[in-house]
């Protein structure tokens, strides 16, 4: 895995482009709603490979492996918790096969839906879940880790503890948050990001936030608290649920790219897209950054 120092050299050279949405684009490719994304991808690998090749062609430098909910506690719903390490390793290897010229981040996410509290017993459970997933991600050859769509500081602390125990060198932390910089738990994000910096995070920021005129300001607020590279991976605006039951986004790629350029000007060093974005959004962002 990359060290924090190697990762920071990459961020110092230029703005780093991440990828866009995975789940919503896989649904467009035929993945049924409500299924286990991780197992569906292993059964239909070409759908993921096609999507990630498009991202690489658009300029993506870091691909997120499709391991979003590949922790034991989530895989248990499919009776697959015993295969946690193997599933994560296979999914990372699948993303690694897309290109030799990009980095692959092992993707972890919130486990808030699986716990009623963050007392000592539950915190230890989260750490063990993340440890098993991280082992698989490292076995598969992940270059770094990304813990994204986090909702609570305790989740980030559990990931950080697990990463340290497993010897993972480079981990980014990304929260979903309000435009004013508060988490959905009500706590202010800034001090939490500062504590993650002190704990050895490689980058911090946000994702799954609706891109709008306030997004660049959110980048500015977070930069007051940290010297780390700030990650910005918002949605393509606000979704509308269609008659097909899927979320639809009206923001165009050029509109999104304009906002991302402003986020870059406010100091964001890692730019990508979340729900509702695709390779066209990444390509438009790349063009906006180079004009």
Predicted features along the sequence, with ranges:
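Domain-level signal for soluble alpha/beta catalytic cores
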Residues: 1-291
